[in-house]
């Protein structure tokens, strides 16, 4: 893992017997992305995450896709989450809390986050089909769980209504992107302060 102390940039690589995942990101970017996980639909979702959060994101993942997509999906969430946490540094000045409500045609999803170093996921999302393309829909919860745990954020995702499974998933990723964009933004009125009366996050 490498972190630039003057800017909110991090690079993380994770190698196991199941996957090899590389992530480089810039929290203060322009939403530029270069993503290749070997899973087309996951790539599409990570591109949405980058574009709508304005986080510059590069992802390279190689995994045991001949078995299934589980390990690659989960490990990609792990490494992106870890990179976000590392890039945040001391967490000083961030707004910390944010909520985004994302409509997408017939679908509407609410995402709330607390960038607190207290990881937790509430997932109130259901699907009407077991797969989107070749990807099992149950894997999306695995991705968000891995991301929240390793980014150190409390993450609540609730699909309030919707019928189209693609729209439901995409609204979850876009909701995370918009909430993350707001929560990690530096508040100029509190730029050098930890956003907690305790003076520390995570305890």
Curated annotation (Swiss-Prot):
Q: Where in the cell is it found?
A: Cytoplasm
Q: Which Gene3D superfamilies match?
A: Imidazole glycerol phosphate dehydratase, domain 1
Q: Which pathway features in its UniProt record?
A: Amino-acid biosynthesis; L-histidine biosynthesis; L-histidine from 5-phospho-alpha-D-ribose 1-diphosphate: step 6/9
GO cellular component terms attached to this protein's record: cytoplasm
One Pfam family hit: IGPD
Q: What enzyme category does the UniProt record give?
A: lyase
Gene Ontology MF terms: imidazoleglycerol-phosphate dehydratase activity
**What reaction gets catalysed by this protein?**
D-erythro-1-(imidazol-4-yl)glycerol 3-phosphate = 3-(imidazol-4-yl)-2-oxopropyl phosphate + H2O
> What are the protein's UniProt keywords?
Amino-acid biosynthesis, Cytoplasm, Histidine biosynthesis, Lyase
Q: What is one process in the GO biological process aspect for this record? A: L-histidine biosynthetic process
Q: Which domain of life is it from?
A: Bacteria
Its main subcellular localisation, reduced to a broad class, is: cytoplasm
> Which Cys-Cys disulfides exist here?
none
> Lyase: is it a keyword of this entry?
yes
Q: Does the keyword Cytoplasm apply?
A: yes
Per the UniProt entry, the Enzyme Commission number(s) are 4.2.1.19
As for family, the record states: Belongs to the imidazoleglycerol-phosphate dehydratase family.
The name of this protein is: Imidazoleglycerol-phosphate dehydratase
Species of the source: Parvibaculum lavamentivorans (strain DS-1 / DSM 13023 / NCIMB 13966)
